Amino acid sequence: ILAFIGDGRSSESYVHTWIYSMDYYRNFLASMITCQTKPGYLTHLGYNAVALPAVCVLFFTKNKSWRPLRLIFLGATAMLLIPAFGWAFNGFSYMANRWVWAYGMIIAYIVAVTWQDLCKISTGKGLGIIIAIAVYSLAALLMMNEINHNIIFSLITALLIVIVCMILNKSAKKLIAPVLAVILVFASFAGNSAYFFSSHGNNHIASYVSYGAVN
């Protein structure tokens, strides 16, 4: 604590607000599953497409043991939306969500906990999740500043994961649903990476120095 307080940045004068800019909130939903859209304030999300169905399973399943995890997810999400937490977790200097890595760990844990239930999801629950993802998609697309290919790809992949698990979980070959779901998960990883690094997306690779330019 003393190290944070004694840091030179703490003595600097920064603008503190009770809410983030409107662009932050407009792009927040889309930024959850796309690397091309960032709300700002070092809030780097861009999770795999499977995160969206996993969160839906968490809330659509009557499992009392998951109640603390639901509260943690809701609380952490609320903290990302309130600048005071970004300011506090950044050493009381300026608003930045550097702690977002912890939010990523929560999402990863939710995926791990709900994976088995997702792979054997019932038709009724699957349809409910598809509707929820459709509503989420509509809200994200309408709110974000600029629609990109990455968000479309991620949303379609999320829907395909649910459809595959819903239709094929009763197949005679019990492994077919989880295997196809894993393939879609890796496709989402590849898609996010491609859009992040390629010139058709964020073109992040252009920020690197070529080997020949290094002294």
For every predicted segment, state its role:
Residues L71-L80, N90, A96-A213:
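Contiguous transmembrane helix-bundle modules in multi-pass membrane proteins
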